[in-house]
Amino acid sequence: MNTIIDASNDAKYRKYQDAIRKCIALFQTVEQWPDYISFLTKLHKVLQTHSSFVNIPCSLLVSRALAECLSPGLPSGVHKKTLEVYDYIFTIIGSKTLTNELSTWSYGLTPFFSISSIKTKHDYINIIKKHYVSLGVGIRPCFQAVFISLLSGLEEDVDESSQEVYHLLDDLVKVLNDEKFAWGCIWSTILSFPSQRPGALAYLLRVCNNLAEEDIQTRVIQPDSGLVVRSFAAAISDNDILVQRGYMDALLNYFPIQSTFYKDVKPFDLKLLHMSVASIVLRNDLSLNRRFYAWLMGLSKDTELSISDSSITVDENTLQQNMAIFFEGVKDLLSSKNSLMSFYKAFRILYALSDRRPLFTIVESQILPCVLHSYETLTNVFHRDDSKHLYESAVDHGRRLIMKFSDSELHTFLFHCVNKIVANTTENSDSAEAVKFILDSQNFFFESINTEYSFIIFTNLLMHLEKTSPNSDVDGVSMTILTICKILLNNFDWNFFNYNNSAIDSYAKCTLNLDSDFENGILTYEILYKKCKCSLLSLLKQYIKDSHVHHEVLLISLNLIKEASDTEFENEFLDLSLQGFKDNSWSFQTLGSFVKQLPSRILINSTACVNVILDRIWCELCMFSYFREEELLSVIWTLQEKLQTRIIESYFSTCIVKEQLELRAPTIYYTPFYNLLKKSAQQSLFHFVFDRPLLLLLNSLLEDESGRDYTAMMNWINASSSLQLRVLELMTENLLSLSPNLTSVNSLETAMTRYNINEDQRNSEASRCVYFLKLCTRIISYFQDLHPKEGRLKSAKQVEELCLVTWADALLIQKKSLTYSSFLAFLVKLCLDIVLTPQNIKTSTDVYIIQTWALRLLYQITSIWENPLKFESSLIVGLFALVQEVERSPSSTYRSFILSLLQMLEFLLSRLDGTIDLSSEQHYLLSNFVLVGMLNDDPGLSPKWLHAIKKLLPLLLQNLQLLMVNPIQSLCKFVHSFLDQHESMYLKYPDPVKDYACMDVFIAKLKMLSELVSAALLEFTYSPGPKKSNLEANGIIGNVISGVFAAESSGVSIDVNKRLSMLLTMQDALQTLFLSYSWHIRSSYADKTSKVFMNDSSVLKEASLSGLKEFYFCEPLECVETLVQIYLENNVECCQCIWDIFSFLSDSEPQYIVKQLVSSFFAREGIASYAGPSSLTAKITQLDILCCMSDFVSRVEGENTSKIFTEISKFVREIISSSNSFKNYLLVCLRMLLEVAKNVNTYCESRQQKDFIDLMGKTLSSVLFHAGKSSDPNLTVDFLAYHKAAADTFEVAKTQKKTSSVYLFVKYLDPSLLDFFCSEFVPKITELSKEEDKLVAWATSIVNVFITPLVKARTFPESLTTYHLDLLLVLSKHPFLSKSWRRDFWEIFNDNSLFRFDIDQLRKLSPVIYTALYQEISRLNDLITKSDLGVTTLFTSRDTQLGARQSNICRITILMLSSPRDFFLPSLPPLIDLVKRLITSDPEGVLKKDLFLFIRALALRTSSKHLLPLWPIVVSELLIIFKSYCMPNVAISKETLLDACRLLDFLTALKLEEFALHEWVVMLSPLDAVYWSGKTSRKSLVQKVSERLQEQASEKDDKSSVESEHSILTSTTRTPSLGIYTTDAQLRNFLNRISIDAYEESYSFSTIDIQSFENSIYREVLQRFSNAPLSPFSSIKAPSSLAGSSN
């Protein structure tokens, strides 16, 4: 691009111009700083020689050179000489020309004062005083820049130059002749320039000190009070505490809270100021806090600091006015329900304010409801783990804040809430909850509990309830009110108010409007007490139908009776209660509370009350209420403890007698009263309450009336062991300790009882024995003619039931002495006939009873003989048949029959020692017996049946298929069914006892399953012969390979078919045990309410592990292989159970599991030649085994690592020795080694560590040898698609394990390896070895396989997948590995294909770029050198060289964006020099766009203060472009103009302080644009550009773009306004609004969106090298040479 040339025909002027050009060219050849002085001197001489010319030629170039000479990096001598040249130029051009060319000459001079030394400050001041002050109003465009530059000289008042600066500033303001604009500049400086706030404060205080108090606000509050307020808010929020103190002092002394100008400020701005002032308490600085309090109170700073709080008196109305806005601001914070920080901030501010009571009392009453509501919300809603500390701090400060509120305010708030409740307003529910919340924490919130207020509120609420008719609408509020009343009960004593004639508190009386409820006169506490009693009695009558409210009122009434001695109320309450219980209008819940809370003295003195209570209890019993039994017993025991008499016992006895007399039928034994006796048998008070009723029942039992039915009574006694104990205690006076010493009889020949009974002795023992003797006699006489006569079955039932409570030896007792061989023989024959020929019994109803009796009697008789009898063997078979022949029934009689049968069977089996031979038909009977027992779920029967089956194991093993397989399979089905239906079973059995019982049955069957399978496996264990002695395991696969199941296995000593059958059965059983072990995961039992299933999960797991341990002992390899199959079929959670099982089975020796997995792996190598059953080999593959082994190894920790390493080492060496055959398994081996590595260095010996490193290197080499050989371009795409589909399936169904690279190795070799290296290997590479050289070598080998070929082939970025980028990324996280990838990376980076990457890829590569650059910073110098115009290459075209420079500049830009902030500070000077040379030496402006992008990146990644040398260059270039575009004879492309506008947009949006000092050069002052609409100033340069664009416009304005920009301005974040594609209309709109936008961005306190700024640069860099144009009116294309590589 051509620079601006002054057109003049004057030969002297052309000579002058040439001389200037030569001087300017010298500045581009500077090598050392003395050269600057030399060149400045020559320039000065040229100017002196041609001093007759007012206009200086090439003024923009001269001003740029002078601005560069004022760079902070140059010595003060250069600065002094430069200022001298400036002074001379200003002298020769004069004020008029300087005014016209102010933007040309001032942009380099104005920022200098802040960096100047003492030697040059005076020179600068003289220039401003001499040349700028004289400009008058012409200084307006640069006034703020000059003013800000001078503020840095005011930081030290003691400095002599400071006074000179003060006077100079006053002069500038004076000559400007516009105080409004001047103060606008000052306030905007405070708002937008944090570094200049100290100087601005000093000037502000000086001006205010020199003004009269009444003139300060009229002179200073300009041009807008909102701007002033926001400036103060920004300054008080500054990070520098000294700045905060200074501006708080200014507020205190000159802008007090009562200032009139605040009335003109918008509420939002004023609230912003108040919250900024209030937020200074968060700094925990006492001096700031004092200033805050003083400002709120309207005091001066000195007054507040010198006078104690007690002497400060401020009018309350004034304080209320002062704090009105403050209160609104805090209220806004407290209303932010979703902001935890807002709550914390509000609580902190108010808590700090509470230390100043004069201030706090003003807002106390107003803010209390908000604080309480917010604190309640905080404690009930917020539960954030990620901000736990903030949450706890907010809760703590909130609680402490509420404690700061006075008790009177809290009571006032309570009174108001009570009034709302009583008034039945729409807020009554919220008010009730608020009262409840306060009272719940009253011990924290109140200093002391006011008993009078509590009683008054209590009475008022009761009166309100009395007036409110009960309905569903108020039920919730009523319950809340009653909850409040119960809390208030603890705050006062009834007796205190009973006879208290003192008047109630007048404040409470007025606040609660109690006068309206009582007659005129003095209202005393005694009157309230009486009213309270009446209300309670009324409520008891009123809320009878609402059981909840009624119950709560009853509790309150009982509390009054308990604490107050009020006979009158007691009598009325008892009368009401008795009537309620009599007519059943009061619920049973009320009865329970009534008995528990009523004092004992009332119960003892009121027989009628006790009788009514007992009547209600008996009525409840008669209602057959099963679920009320526990409640009834609780009431009975409570009543007995309070009465301490036998009145309850007498009452129940009377009721029983009445029932017996009235009913005269067996139904008496079915009444719920007997269930009550059964449940209460374990209570210590049983004998005091139930002895006499129990005696009545037993007396009826002992009567010999033929019509009496004893069945129900005997069943009832037998149903509870505790009740049996009570019966025995009652009959025998602790019979357990006085039982008779009966001598057992050994044989029939000598069978003679040696126990003598004296019937004349009437003690309990003798009487009971005689009683049982009579029973035996009746049995003998009765069964003589049993079968033919059905009429006596009823009597037989009675006799049999009575025998249930006899002792075993009692049947053998006769009168004094007696031989009874014939008696026993008769009984045995009788019992055998009943047991073996049940068909002879005609009535099925009683068959179970008769057979049960026969079995029990037979058991007693058989036990007399020591040796087995002949009939016992046939009796066992008969028992098997009996189970099949007898019809099953859910009745209790069938249950008793089975129990007797199992007892007899176990007894006979123990006597015969298993010496029983069964025929095939008898085997069937045995199988049926076993299956029936397996299917039985009765909690009482099943364990005994299973125990009997264990005794039958020797018989079961005789016929494996019939007797073992079917029961095992039925058990497996039972387990599956039980676990699948556990939820429905819980609903079926709500009683915990039944839950436990069912679980006990299940556990017993689970153990039986394990024992059956283990016994069968031990019976058919295979021992390989000599030819197969080298096998390490004998599972199914091992047996297949070894030929055990082949046709030629004739030499095998076991039944192969039986063994095969049992191994397959064991697989099913093992899966069943695993299902039980992992049931707690599948069932999600944690969400259930059943305590049984939760507590029994550990028992279930223990039983399952025990069975698995037995399987593993019998068949270790087969057990492991089956677990591998389960591992493959289940999800991730269940797989964790597999590892737990492996750990349990290995018993701290995990190498055995690894050894068995390895054996299984190699055994499968020969499966292809096997012709046996396919089901034995098709379930799992070798890869499946390795996957399982890898996961298992990953979970081995600690010292166990050294145990498994040997086995893994052998296995891996075997694999890599035949890598071609086992190439599909190399990745799994590598993964296993990686998992072992985490513990090798810690727990293994040094020799193992060396072996590990050697093995890892060989394995990695083997893996990489087979990689990189695929040519399929879609391989990675298919791999990613497979990954995504698998991941989606896992998220939706949760039915399979998370996809691992291991499973994809065979099909997708390269991408699965890359995935493994990125996700597992490289992140853990430091765990593999401590030798960095080894690690670097391994990383290099990986890079050489996956990255280097792509680099050499130049196929990136298309061939660089996300995995390749991830690999570079994870490698870059280990700096010492950079040697492995840096060379390839720099080849990628230096190739122009870099610019074909997308933004996301470049962002992902950012850490890689930064790491590479950090370790080779010299690369940056190389790029700078290659980008310099002075570097050329022989035999290279100009376009190629230009393209190389463009690409290298863009590379530097990418480097800049990839690095952290201020990383390039050491290299900043050469970078800025590069920008200078390229901008000033680029004749066609081709590099402008690239340089502008680089400047944007530099501004984004470098602190603005470090870029001071750069800004003059940038500003001058913008000046040149904009001025040139406005000139008709200079060709500037719109593309270049757009680039310049984007740069200006970027820098103004960043709000860099140092650049903001130069914005006035090209754009209108924001103050002029906002407040004066630009009427007071000349058109800015950007306005002229906009008009020029308008002249050339070929399209209408795009209104939509304007509106979109307005929406951007209202955002809380700042982003660049101009996009990559920008129309003329959008550009004009931007230029017209840039000043206003800049002001609004500062005014609104918006923050920058870093990512948007970065993306804007990335997009334009990448677009620069694409074929698409940058904008619709782009006129310059990237050179064709950009497609080539950089040089």
Swiss-Prot record:
It comes from the Eukaryota. It is a peripheral membrane protein. InterPro entries: DOP1 (IPR040314), DOP1_C (IPR056457), DOP1_N (IPR007249). Coiled coil: none annotated. GO terms for cellular component: cytoplasm; cytosol; endosome; Golgi membrane; trans-Golgi network. The keyword Signal does not apply. Keywords: Golgi apparatus, Membrane, Phosphoprotein, Protein transport, Transport. It is found in: Golgi apparatus membrane. Transmembrane segments: none annotated. The modification Phosphoserine is found at residue 1671. One of its GO terms (biological process) is endoplasmic reticulum organization. Belongs to the DOP1 family. PANTHER family: DOPEY-RELATED (PTHR14042), PROTEIN DOPEY-1 HOMOLOG (PTHR14042:SF24). Involved in cellular morphogenesis. Required for traffic between late Golgi and early endosomes, and for the normal structure and organization of the endoplasmic reticulum. This is Protein dop1. It comes from Schizosaccharomyces pombe (strain 972 / ATCC 24843) (Fission yeast). The lineage of its organism: Eukaryota, Fungi, Dikarya, Ascomycota, Taphrinomycotina.
